[in-house]
Swiss-Prot record:
Phosphoprotein keyword on record: yes
GO molecular function terms attached to this record: ATP binding; ATP hydrolysis activity; magnesium ion binding; P-type potassium transmembrane transporter activity
Keyword field contains Metal-binding: yes
EC number, UniProt record: 7.2.2.6
Main location: membrane
Chain ranges passing through the membrane: 44-64, 66-86, 233-253, 257-277, 588-608, 616-636, 658-678
Residues binding Mg(2+): 518, 522
Organism of origin: Xanthomonas campestris pv. campestris (strain ATCC 33913 / DSM 3586 / NCPPB 528 / LMG 568 / P 25)
Gene3D superfamilies documented for this protein: Calcium-transporting ATPase, cytoplasmic domain N, Calcium-transporting ATPase, cytoplasmic transduction domain A, HAD superfamily/HAD-like
UniProt name for this protein: Potassium-transporting ATPase ATP-binding subunit
Function: Part of the high-affinity ATP-driven potassium transport (or Kdp) system, which catalyzes the hydrolysis of ATP coupled with the electrogenic transport of potassium into the cytoplasm. This subunit is responsible for energy coupling to the transport system and for the release of the potassium ions to the cytoplasm.
Length: 682
């Protein structure tokens, strides 16, 4: 389900997983985290640290074999360090990403101007810019702050922020008018309006997020922490009651063995890895060039039930081009062509530009008339046009144009519906053109469904995720494209309020909803959705409303976001299963060591035939410690995700991480025992 660019970015991030500088920083941080305040955040590791201190006190007081006591103390201490190291290495990777972003933030001087049209120019430090200021940026200069272009267009290099080397076009009056501080203008000149306070820019927020400054536990993570705490408390009570029970059968238990039993009983593996898994989830989203504003957003993406997907750019390539002019009976093709071109001269959309291009190719002369008043397209009117010299030309959705003509007291030829249906059934978009009270004809806009998208939707369906296509097209076009793409449902002739209403309806049914948006009119729906993925190229309002921002501005990235979320949940579940399963083998190592001397029949539990009770304890504790760093790469990279049903995923993970979690420790503890015999003797 993942796209190739996402995979490539993730592989580049993984290549630096164990970079020397990252390792060194993580090692230092592991020791710095040995504070009560930090350890108490993880009940499991807090108990292990308490056991470490108690073992040290018992050994220092001269109880039992000093060598064995200090060995147990050292292994327990290293277990805590490894847990801290797992979290620290995830944080260090985040700080590495933040450092690269910080290099993009420069001490710049801005050319502040009086109005959007220019005026007197004043050079000021970028830190003095405030929302509402107008700034002029020319070729070769850096954009000093976040803002919206109000005049001009330019190609901009955003590699310092997004990692993409290809320049992007930003233009005033379009849905790609947003600029980010720290990026560089490669050509042309723009005036933009500042939208962010100093220290609150997009880059500043990115740095804070990837550094973990706003890192908070997700609801599922909190629930799992509470479960681990309850299990730890239960095992603590059980172990504390063992000496009294053993006393009834005349057995005296070594307190060091009791500490070892407790540490082996409690789920130390997942306890040590849980913080790293949460941090790594946000890092994986960042590796996919998606900025998640919280860990909760990443996690919820893995639980979504419904995806609301814009047709353009997500399901189709988003490059609708005018291909044919269809005049109605009695209308000359040149008349329709010229009217459509006039209505599109000031249209900044790709569709509008393609109409002008097609008209020119067919002989029209594109000269902007004087005293023309251009009518911009809005989601409410769903049409645009031009008023000039007594002529009123409109182009837009069929029903919107019909309503416009009928409002002037005119009737519409039945032929129009036939033309619209003919174009729509072919999967193209019909754009109706009218002048005054007369409908002139239909412009055919063609787009292509993306290759492989139908298979992706089939995978989502297998996982129980419903897909809903949102389009401004008429129902016939929407139905044709929906059938070709394989989506489960569609909303035709959609307006912003329709998106919001659909999200609320799905949520009322207990479902989690994800959607993509880039315009100001998408902001309410983005804010309402459980996962709102805003496009980096979109408006500031959209980016503020969403809980994720795609730096590549690719609407299809929502599918990759779902993959990252699923991988986050599967990784936590798989490692929790493994942690609980591998406790079984440790029971068979520790229990015979506790009771075999006094109760010979307990020796039957020594199924691994470990050499001695002390070696059994040391082998179990060593495995318990070493398994944490051994699983760090898996925790950070995530368990490999294959789209399938929840039942199939559960079966696969139980087989690999459940059964594997039982069998691997048996073999590992036996090998460690053999190594101890070879090193220390029987």
């Amino acid at each position: 389900m993942s796209t190739i660019p996402v995979i490539e970015k993730r592989e580049r991030a993984d290549a630096k997983l164990f970079d020397g500088a990252v390792l060194l920083a993580a090692m230092r941080a592991a020791f710095l985290k040995l504070t009560p305040r930090h350890l108490l955040r993880s009940p499991v590791m807090a108990v292990v640290m308490g056991g470490t201190l108690l073992a040290a006190v018992i050994t220092a007081s001269g109880h039992g074999n000093a060598g064995f006591g200090w060995a147990v103390t050292a292994i327990l201490f290293v277990t805590v360090l490894f847990g801290n190291f797992a979290e620290a290495i995830a944080e260090a990777r985040g700080r590495g990403q933040a450092a690269s972003l910080r290099r993009a933030r420069k001490d710049l001087v801005a050319r502040r101007v009086e109005t959007a049209l220019g005026g007197r120019e004043t050079r000021v430090p970028a830190a003095e810019l405030r929302p509402g200021d107008f700034v002029l940026v020319s070729e070769g200069e850096f954009v000093p702050a976040d803002g919206e272009i109000v005049r001009g267009l330019a190609t901009i290099n955003e590699a310092a922020v997004t990692g993409e080397s290809a320049p992007v076009l930003r233009e005033a009056g379009t849905d790609r008018s947003g600029v980010i501080g720290g990026t560089r203008v490669l050509s042309d000149e723009i005036v933009f309006k500042v939208t962010a306070e100093p220290g609150q820019s997009f880059l500043d927020r990115m740095i804070a997020l990837v550094e973990g400054a706003n890192r908070q536990k997700t609801p599922n993570e909190i629930a799992l922490t509470l479960l681990l705490a309850a299990m730890t408390l239960t095992f603590l009570i059980v172990v504390a009651s063992l000496p009294a029970i053993a006393g009834f059968v005349g057995v005296t238990l070594d307190p060091l063995l009791l500490i070892a039993l407790l540490v082996c009983l409690i789920p130390t593996t997942i306890g040590g890895l849980l913080p790293a898994i949460g941090i790594a989830g946000m890092n994986r989203a960042m590796s996919a060039n998606v900025l998640a504003k919280s860990g909760k957003a990443v996690e919820v993406a893995g639980d979504v039930d419904v995806l609301l997907l814009d047709k353009t750019g997500t399901i189709t390539y988003g490059d609708r081009q005018a291909t044919v002019f269809h005049p109605l009976a009695g209308i000359d093709r040149a008349q329709l062509r010229d009217a459509a071109m006039l209505a599109s001269l000031a249209d900044p959309t790709p569709e509008g530009k393609s109409i002008v291009k097609l008209a020119r190719q067919q002989g029209a002369v594109a000269v902007e008339p004087e005293d023309a008043h251009f009518i911009a397209f809005t989601a409410q009117t769903r049409m645009s046009g031009v008023d000039l010299a007594g002529r009123n030309i409109r182009k837009g959705a069929g029903d919107a144009i019909v309503a416009y003509v009928q409002a002037q007291g005119a009737t519409v030829s039945p032929e129009l519906n036939g033309r619209i249906e003919e174009v729509a059934r072919g999967g193209a978009t019909p754009l109706v053109v009218a002048e005054g009270r007369h409908v002139l004809g239909v412009v055919e806009l063609s787009d292509v469904v993306k290759q492989g998208i139908k298979e992706k939707f089939a995978q989502l369906r297998a996982m129980g995720i419903k897909t809903v296509m949102i389009t401004g097209d008429n129902p016939l076009t929407a139905a044709a494209i929906a059938a070709e793409a394989g989506v489960d449902d569609y909303i035709a002739q959609a307006r912003p309020e329709d998106k919001l209403a659909r999200i609320r309806a799905e949520q009322a049914g207990g479902r989690l909803v994800a959607m993509v948006g880039d315009g100001t009119n998408d902001a309410p729906a983005l804010a309402q959705a459980d996962v709102g993925l805003a496009m980096n190229s979109g408006t500031q309002a959209a980016k503020e409303a969403g809980n994720m921002v795609d730096l590549d501005s690719d609407p299809a990235k929502l599918l990759a976001v779902v993959e990252v979320g699923k991988q986050q949940l599967i990784t936590r579940g798989a490692l929790t299963t493994f942690s609980l399963a591998n406790d079984v083998s440790k029971y068979f190592a520790i229990l015979p060591a506790l009771f075999a001397a006094a109760i010979p029949s307990m020796a039957a539990l020594n199924v691994m035939h470990l050499s001695s009770p002390r070696h059994a304890v040391l082998a179990a504790l060593i495995f318990n410690a070493l398994i944490i760093p051994a699983l760090i790469p898996l925790a950070l990279r995530g368990v490999r995700f294959r789209p399938s049903s929840a039942t199939a995923l559960l079966r696969r993970n139980m087989l690999i991480y459940g059964l594997g979690g039982v069998l691997l420790p048996f073999a590992a503890i036996k090998l460690i025992d053999l190594a101890l015999v070879a090193t220390l003797g029987a």
